[in-house]
Amino acid sequence: MAVGKNKRLTKGGKKGAKKKVVDPFSKKDWYDVKAPAMFNIRNIGKTLVTRTQGTKIASDGLKGRVFEVSLADLQNDEVAFRKFKLITEDVQGKNCLTNFHGMDLTRDKMCSMVKKWQTMIEAHVDVKTTDGYLLRLFCVGFTKKRNNQIRKTSYAQHQQVRQIRKKMMEIMTREVQTNDLKEVVNKLIPDSIGKDIEKACQSIYPLHDVFVRKVKMLKKPKFELGKLMELHGEGGSSGKTTGDETGAKVERADGYEPPVQESV
């Protein structure tokens, strides 16, 4: 038997020794998520990402992240049944600049509108905005009782349903086709499209609870940083007013950030 040290035993140390536990959060950084200038509250939250290591760049991990935010949080409002999807398109410093990616109604709102003794009318249409975004809009509306109606049901005839659906599609196409994405989002915030449909269909059959219930982003044009900065009120004068109001809040957030970095 050869005399000497058993290298395997000394190399590995004690068998079954505990590994040193590394806190995964020590390798991560917090980034602020910024909403476009269309919304009143710009600073919507923070997101976590692993720090840049070698070829793995932190900003690449952030781009394409989708955040779903209630409209009440974006507008500092009480009405909270609309949810907006915002997608990160660029990272500037510690800020993730987002753009509109979709809209939806909350499940409880949708369920509260569906009732007996009325007709539910749905329509959807694919439309392209003037700046090249292809959107799919879904609309929903419900028939209601006419004034002085005694009968408890208010069902529309199939012919009327088809007419109303045609009107819905016409109005949605018209409102989106003639505007860019920023103007479309400005219409979705108060849901002026739903109100227009309600007025237009009054002559066919009285409607209530008419909403654009969902907006899907199907296709986007090539990414341009200038346009994104304009959306965030960096290049346009119109966005400056809302940008300045929340500017103070953003500075406070940035002032709070450095101590965390020093500790890391």
Swiss-Prot record:
The modification Phosphotyrosine is found at residue 256. The modification ADP-ribosyltyrosine is found at residue 155. It is found in: Cytoplasm; Nucleus; Nucleus, Nucleolus. GO terms for molecular function: mRNA 5'-UTR binding; mRNA binding; structural constituent of ribosome; translation initiation factor binding. One of its GO terms (cellular component) is small ribosomal subunit. Residues 232-264 are annotated as: Disordered. GO terms for biological process: cell differentiation; negative regulation of apoptotic process; positive regulation of fibroblast proliferation; positive regulation of translation; response to ethanol; ribosomal small subunit biogenesis; translation. Belongs to the eukaryotic ribosomal protein eS1 family. There is a cross-link at residues 34, 249 (Glycyl lysine isopeptide (Lys-Gly) (interchain with G-Cter in SUMO2)). Keywords: Acetylation, ADP-ribosylation, Cytoplasm, Differentiation, Isopeptide bond, Nucleus, Phosphoprotein, Ribonucleoprotein, Ribosomal protein, Ubl conjugation. The protein designated S3b has the same amino acid sequence as S3a except that it lacks the C-terminal 12 residues. It is probable that S3a is converted by proteolysis, either physiologically or fortuitously, to S3b. Component of the small ribosomal subunit. Mature ribosomes consist of a small (40S) and a large (60S) subunit. The 40S subunit contains about 33 different proteins and 1 molecule of RNA (18S). The 60S subunit contains about 49 different proteins and 3 molecules of RNA (28S, 5.8S and 5S). Identified in a IGF2BP1-dependent mRNP granule complex containing untranslated mRNAs. Binds with high affinity to IPO4. Interacts with DDIT3. Part of the small subunit (SSU) processome, composed of more than 70 proteins and the RNA chaperone small nucleolar RNA (snoRNA) U3. The modification N6-acetyllysine is found at residues 34, 56, 249. Component of the small ribosomal subunit. The ribosome is a large ribonucleoprotein complex responsible for the synthesis of proteins in the cell. Part of the small subunit (SSU) processome, first precursor of the small eukaryotic ribosomal subunit. During the assembly of the SSU processome in the nucleolus, many ribosome biogenesis factors, an RNA chaperone and ribosomal proteins associate with the nascent pre-rRNA and work in concert to generate RNA folding, modifications, rearrangements and cleavage as well as targeted degradation of pre-ribosomal RNA by the RNA exosome. InterPro entries: Ribosomal_eS1, Ribosomal_eS1_CS, Ribosomal_eS1_euk. It holds the Pfam family Ribosomal_S3Ae. This is Small ribosomal subunit protein eS1. The modification Phosphoserine is found at residues 237, 263. Residues 242-255 have a biased composition (Basic and acidic residues). Its main location: cytoplasm.
